[in-house]
Amino acid sequence: MICKYIYLAIFVFGTARIPKPSACLPGDFWKTKQEIEVQKKIDEFNQYRISALWSMVSKMEDPTLSGLDGRYIVVDQNQLYLSPISKKSEKLIFRFNLNHRGYLEVKSGFRAFIENKYSPLVFHATSWTNGFSIDVQKTNPISSYTPFVMQYLNSPWFSACRVESGNWQVFVGRMNMNEHEHCYPMSLIMKREDTWLRYYHKNNRNPIDWKLVQDCAMWPDGYPGTGRESEKGSNLEAITR
């Protein structure tokens, strides 16, 4: 009889210590390995997408653009610049696929291409290449510079060359600064705070920055310029930092 009460006491005491269902900690112990792997892939995709949306600031100026597309640089007189230089300048657009690789597309539908190494970035109505790509980093998606790094044929190097006072042009490849004293190697990136292209020098300095042109606050399509309108300048101006 005593043993019966002892067993009953142990049972009551033991069940009292079992946590209620609402107190259970969340976990993956009820999921199969396949379900966990599928969820990880979904989380990874969402991380990419969140990063992209942060980078583009998701300011939808054009209803035809998706959340992973964004404004880029401009075409003027068949040459590519980092900011509008005339009212004829045409915006280029990022186009992303599901693998988060990208290419440049002129609004008319033509794609950007480069004729040869160390040539200006130009576009043509019939010939084009998909050599451009955009690397999307998984880590640190929210930083002073966005995860988008421009590449051409798997190389991140471009050169900014001063054509004349106040006029800079972007070339493909890394120019030899000893041979071209007015050219600076750079990597092209997309800044989070605005959707204008910025770049950095190999030592992480930013020797040149680009400003918007005052009389090109509105594009020919009627949509306003993106980014910090307070940074508009009267011409293409280089800033040494």
UniProtKB/Swiss-Prot annotation:
Highest classification ranks of the organism: Eukaryota, Fungi, Dikarya, Ascomycota, Taphrinomycotina
Function: Has a role in meiosis.
A cellular-component GO term for this protein: mitochondrion
Predominant subcellular localization, coarse grouping: mitochondrion
Location in or out of the cell: Mitochondrion
GO biological process: meiotic cell cycle
Keywords, alphabetical: Meiosis, Mitochondrion
Protein name as it appears in the record: Meiotically up-regulated gene 130 protein
